[in-house]
């Protein structure tokens, strides 16, 4: 029986555990929080911090694993590549993953290799970051180089706002490194979705529309998605070509990726992020429902050195959307009301994560979501209208904090 080590413990790991079990694989989950929900589904739990590369390597040797993954769990991606390379397991090269997972190194790589990239610079020192303020054209984005889920990210309109943003980013950074980059204003919607390569060939390239809630405490946390993308076909083709080039240059092999892209108002396509892991917010699960292609199962097969299925660029047959259920008020959860007609016509899957009486916090990050809706529509415009006006169809019942 093959043995698979999954780094992390949140609910996004559960589909991986279930898929691995379908293959007859023994699954071990690993993090330092034994009460995390994924550990209830795995065959074994290992209590180690996933950012401690040497400790995870030692455990992996003792556990005699055949594969390692860090699905939808950004802090574990570098550890996953490190352990995999040390043990000779399938996976992306550690050196390449180190570039992809550190925003300052990634921006430098893109610049050095002729990709479209915003003007950016990395810092490990508050004074130096502030001193360089005049190097940039505002607005800028200030963020940690090593965090995901919009933690520590601030859009800054002028120098006066920069001090607080720099402090905020340093506080959220594990390695105490931040990056300041010029903000790329987008034309249409940005894209945040999953892709797949086999033997350095990009075989499944998806693009979508990413939506945000301007009323949320943190307006940079994705609140919804729809497929297909509203980016022009020629921009999608150029982005696909550039993603393919990046995969080959970094020799990433066979892997699932979360990829963030956009078209700037300057008309140029930009790769904003490419991480060799699945995205959060159940993106690969939605893509399976929408396209019939199972990226999660194939990522597991790849991690274990098993042959993957034949994958092709997606055909959506209409429009699909995912809404991240969240609250902009804090309180005690009393339930969710969904418009019956809307549910009948559009809801393919609903997943509520709370019980009556549970705590609800404001939407400061992806970890404050309280469920998801997966929906089907006839057109992109219909999907976009729905996810941007979800208050018409969905009500969260709360006993609000006083």
Specify the residue positions occupied by each region the protein language model found.
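Short, conserved charged micro-motifs
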Residues: 55, 129, 162-164, 330-336, ...
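A structural supersecondary motif
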Residues: 257, 342-358
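ATP-binding N-terminal substructure of ATP-dependent carboxylate-amine bond-forming enzymes
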Residues: 1-95, 306-309, 318, 327, ...
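A glycine-rich beta-turn/hairpin centered on an aromatic-Pro dipeptide
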Residues: 304-346
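Phosphate-binding core of ATP-grasp and ATP-grasp-like enzymes
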Residues: 169-177, 184-228, 237-271, 275-283, ...
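Short, well-ordered beta-strand elements within core beta-sheets of diverse protein domains
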Residues: 154, 182, 227-228, 288, ...
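Active-site nucleotide/adenylate-binding loops and adjacent lid/helix of ATP-dependent enzymes
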Residues: 99-179, 199, 229-241, 245, ...
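ATP-dependent carboxylate-activation loops
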Residues: 277-298
């Amino acid at each position: 029986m093959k043995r698979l080590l999954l780094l992390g413990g949140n609910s996004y790991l559960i589909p991986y555990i279930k898929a691995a079990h379908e293959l007859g694989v023994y699954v071990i989950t690993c993090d330092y929080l034994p009460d995390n929900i994924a550990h209830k589904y795995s065959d074994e739990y290992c209590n180690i911090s996933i950012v401690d590369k040497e400790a995870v390597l030692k455990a992996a040797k003792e556990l005699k694993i055949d594969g390692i993954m860090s699905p939808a769990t950004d802090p574990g991606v570098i550890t996953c590549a490190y352990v995999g390379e040390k043990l000779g397991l399938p996976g992306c090269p550690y050196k390449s993953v180190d570039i992809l997972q550190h925003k300052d190194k990634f921006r430098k790589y893109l610049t050095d290799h002729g990709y479209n990239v915003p003007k950016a610079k990395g810092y490990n020192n508050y004074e130096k970051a502030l001193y360089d303020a005049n190097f940039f054209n505002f607005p800028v984005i200030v963020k940690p180089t090593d965090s995901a889920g919009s933690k520590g990210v601030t859009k800054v309109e002028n120098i006066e706002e920069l001090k607080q943003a720099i402090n905020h980013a340093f506080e959220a950074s594990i390695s105490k490194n931040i990056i300041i980059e010029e903000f790329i204003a987008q034309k249409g919607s940005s894209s945040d979705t999953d892709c797949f390569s086999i033997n350095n060939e990009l075989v499944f390239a998806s693009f979508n529309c990413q939506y945000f809630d301007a009323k949320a405490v943190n307006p940079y946390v994705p609140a919804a998605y729809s497929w297909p993308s509203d980016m022009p076909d020629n921009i999608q083709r150029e982005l696909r070509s550039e993603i393919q080039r990046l995969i080959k240059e970094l020799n990433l092999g066979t892997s699932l990726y979360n990829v963030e892209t956009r078209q700037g108002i300057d008309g140029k396509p930009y790769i904003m992020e490419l991480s060799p892991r699945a995205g959060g917010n159940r993106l690969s699960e939605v893509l399976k429902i929408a396209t019939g292609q199972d990226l999660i199962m194939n990522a597991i097969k790849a991690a274990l050195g098993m042959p993957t299925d034949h994958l092709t660029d997606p055909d959506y047959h209409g429009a699909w959307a995912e809404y991240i259920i969240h609250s902009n008020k804090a309180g005690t959860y009393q339930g969710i009301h969904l418009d019956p007609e809307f549910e009948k016509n559009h809801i393919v899957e609903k997943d509520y994560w709370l019980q009556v009486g549970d705590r609800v916090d404001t939407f400061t990050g992806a970890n404050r979501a309280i469920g998801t809706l997966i929906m089907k529509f006839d057109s992109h415009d219909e999907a976009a209208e729905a996810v941007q006006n979800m208050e018409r169809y969905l009500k969260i019942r709360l006993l609000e904090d006083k």
